[in-house]
Amino acid sequence: ASDVYKRQGMDTEHLDMIKRCYEEMYSHRPIFFLDEIQIVPHWEQFVRRLADQKYRVYVTGSNAKMLSKDIATTLGGRFMIQYVYPFSFREYLSSNGVQLDKLWIYKNRSEVVRHFDTYFRFGGLPELLVAEGQEKRQWLSSLFNKIFFGDLVARYSIRNDMALKVLIRKLAESVKQPSSFTRLANLVSSTGKKITTDTIIDYLNYLEDTWIMFSLENYASKLADKVSNKKYYFMDNGILSLFLMDPETSLLENLVAVTLKKRYGDALYFYHRNLEVDFYLDEGHKAIQVSYSLKDPETRKREVNALLKLAENVAVDDLCIITRDEEEMIVEGEKTIRVVPVWRWLLDDEG
């Protein structure tokens, strides 16, 4: 749709003309579906007129600018927002013909685990359901290039596209740790692609505006650090996997982050202050650590102690460690920590 808008040089007068032509041909009122409409200047004024005339309108787009304050003011209270994410694991299973009931852990466990291995590595974009093997990675690579050159480089008139690509790779390599603007600028510049901190800030905003990535703030930090020292995650595991040689642990945390972001939105944080907890929900009193395995004694001690120490400092009732395949209950004094494999957590918490 966006290519059509660009080629035709559309504006709101063209949209009004399409509406008039329809009304001359048909007597019943249409339902409007406007895809990637943000390409059309002042599109929100056209949509406001439709809403005032009691038309039903669906507007979709892949840029967060659609939700800016100016547009919200023009539309008034005449809209509801629905974020669309890649398939959840349950949706992915359903699309592959796997239907789960309350006893699925006994009936479908092996089938669920087999499908999860593919979902984990290639993500939940619907088009991948019809791709096989290596075709999945080729399709993901083509999709990323389309987003990179179309939604990023062309839309924002980026001249230093190689620096942007290096930044994306560095963010992928750093997906489990906070990254300050200065650190990212130094990482990119160290590859020979000189870049300023201000440009890094612009590029990060572009990546979030186009839904390639999202960020989490540190609940325990001061306001200035909340803004400048965030953790960055990719909206889909498949895109992240394109940039990693050994992706397992990063994919695990990224998948948990996407799932929690979908469920809790802006209420989701990480917690870093004298301890490191991957995900923290103040409103739900939840704390979640992500660890590929707890078999190493030092890893187990680190992950468990971080949750217990957090529980001493803030109100938290639900303590959880999400692993790749391990499951148990850890009891420490009055606190119980659930250890759950990610594929089960995805389905139990959704169901």
Pin down the residues of each PLM region.
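Short, small-residue-biased leader/transition segments that mark boundaries at the very start
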Residues: 1-5
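Conserved ATPase-coupling elements of RecA-like P-loop NTPase cores
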Residues: 10-12, 38-47, 69-70
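Conserved P-loop NTPase "ATPase switch" module shared by AAA+ and STAND
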Residues: 26-41
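Conserved catalytic/switch belt of AAA+ P-loop NTPases
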Residues: 44-59, 73
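Interdomain motor-coupling "hinge/lid" segment immediately C-terminal to the ATP-binding subdomain
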Residues: 64, 69-178
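Accessory nucleic acid-recognition modules appended to NTPase machines
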Residues: 129, 133-287, 292
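Nucleic-acid nuclease catalytic cores
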Residues: 272, 314-333
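Domain-level recognition of nuclease-like catalytic cores that cleave nucleotide substrates
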Residues: 325-351
